[in-house]
């Protein structure tokens, strides 16, 4: 059984976070003392093509008691590193990878693939980029400058005709053909990926920005800023709470980073061999 051990002080993978209320060890969202000395990744004895995480000799499980098995080696290493970065205390609220992986393994709400797509399409009807503010004029111009290139990219990439409006009461802003094209795009992904996509959409309140992220059209930081354009505008003009603003941006970026890392690993076969070859 191959085993990859992690030194306690290794911090090569960024700490990514999300809320989790409990684990198979009975932990709650409160900090608990670290009870394990080392974290390791092992090949699954049941499924050799998958990997498991060991805390000392204990297999890591989900809140519902399912052993966490991961097909992608790099994702398993990242999850192990997240546990390894808990030093004296275990801060579950900071462990976004663990929480997101729990969600698509346990599927606590029992969503089917079609139900996940239906929930995603609901966000399209009220996409942040499509419904805009016409006042003040400075904000209106900022939206045009910042969001119009995104719409142009989506329309060119998918041969759609998405258009924005300043009328919040307009009905049927999105035509049936455009809805069908976006829905067909999501049908390409499996249920685990759709769970992750839904999480990103819920953070950004925008399917169109999420698609740009999935296609690597813009950086995570830029996507997060675009999703909060009106908030950023208000803060820049009237807010003096600089540190709270920085915390909010770091929080949303860390959550989206964790989700995108999982999405990318689920849809790409990344191994330590590939990473080693690319860095040499």
Q: Could you say what each language-model-derived stretch is?
A:
Residues 114-182:
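Internal, conserved structured core segments that host functional sites
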Residues 22-110:
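An N-terminal structural lobe/cap that precedes and organizes the functional/catalytic core
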Residues 224-280:
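Long hydrophobic alpha-helical segments typical of transmembrane helices together
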Residues 71-74, 78, 145, 203, ...:
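Conserved active-site and cofactor/substrate-binding residues in soluble primary-metabolism enzymes
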Residues 1-31, 280:
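N-terminal mitochondrial targeting presequence
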Residues 174-240:
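An internal, amphipathic alpha-helical element
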């Amino acid at each position: 059984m191959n085993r990859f051990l992690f030194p306690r002080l290794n911090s090569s993978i960024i700490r990514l976070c999300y809320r989790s209320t409990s684990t198979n060890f009975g932990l709650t969202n409160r900090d608990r003392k670290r009870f394990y000395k080392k974290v390791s990744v092992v090949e699954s004895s049941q499924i050799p093509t998958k990997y498991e995480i060991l805390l000392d000799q204990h297999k890591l499980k989900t809140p519902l008691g399912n052993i966490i098995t991961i097909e992608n080696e790099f994702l398993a290493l990242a999850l192990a590193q997240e546990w390894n970065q808990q030093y004296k205390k275990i801060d579950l609220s900071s462990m976004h990878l663990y929480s997101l992986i729990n969600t698509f393994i346990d599927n606590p709400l029992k969503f089917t693939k079609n139900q996940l797509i239906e929930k995603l399409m609901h966000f399209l009807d009220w996409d942040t980029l499509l419904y805009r503010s016409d006042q003040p004029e400075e904000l209106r111009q900022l939206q045009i400058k910042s969001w119009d290139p995104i719409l142009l990219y989506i329309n060119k990439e998918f041969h759609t005709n998405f258009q924005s409006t300043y009328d919040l009461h307009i009905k049927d802003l999105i035509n049936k053909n455009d809805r069908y094209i976006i829905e067909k795009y999501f049908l390409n992904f499996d249920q685990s990926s759709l769970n992750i996509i839904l999480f990103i959409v819920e953070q950004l309140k925008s399917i169109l920005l999420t698609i740009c992220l999935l296609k690597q059209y813009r950086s995570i930081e830029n996507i997060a800023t675009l999703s909060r354009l009106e908030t950023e505008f208000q803060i820049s003009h009237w807010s003096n709470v600089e540190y709270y603003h920085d915390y909010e941006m770091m929080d949303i970026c860390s959550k989206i980073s964790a989700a995108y890392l999982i999405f990318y690993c689920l849809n790409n076969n990344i191994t330590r061999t590939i990473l080693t070859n690319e860095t040499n």
